[in-house]
Amino acid sequence: LIKQGRITEITNYEETDKVFSMRSIDGEGLYLIPGLWDAHVHYAFDDNMRPAMNALFLAHGVTSVRDTGGPLGLVTEVRNRALEQPTKAPNVYIAGPLIDGTPNVYNDSSPSYPLLSVENNLPTSIQSNTQLLIDNQVDFLKAYEMLSEAQYLELMRLASEEGLLVTGHIPLSMDLFSAVEAGLNGMEHLRNIEMSIATNSRELLKERLSILENPDS
């Protein structure tokens, strides 16, 4: 039994006469599953692919997606169009741009690194850039690799105040356990996890911090 787009009850065939329905569908040879999720997509990554993405999602049973990083204007427009045409697009949840430090990784430097992020190179920019995303009603936030520990902790504080979940990569300036303890709700990929599970993880982190402080050395 489906009510308002949700499967609310499953009964035996012999009991179908007990269920009142405005419409019945013969399911012989068919099957029914809940809508699938794609929890990691980037509408902004490929301009040529983007026009076909919604139709491809629906054709494969994907009815909800998380856009995990892209220019705020672009992903907001994608979400708005999905809301306006719910039968032609999945439910779209957006993070806005990756919240990165300096230099930001996805900075439009090449086709492999399109502009998916916002750089935070000033002490106050984390507050202003994060507040902009909050004001534009993003569904969650995504932390990225080049954030300093101080920037990361400030991002977590702001997210907690707003009740927003934060997903992302483990910043190069931190280890996995510190990032999770600070409030990270999810990990996208397993990048940077290997250092935290090494037997000499403290030494490796110290070496990495030295490289981050002196990138040209």
Predicted regions and their residues:
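Divalent-metal coordination cores built from histidine and acidic residues
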Residues: 27, 31, 36-39, 53-171, ...
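Short pre-active-site segment immediately N-terminal to the catalytic Zn-binding motif
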Residues: 47-52
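Histidine-rich, glycine-flanked metal-binding segment
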Residues: 1-33
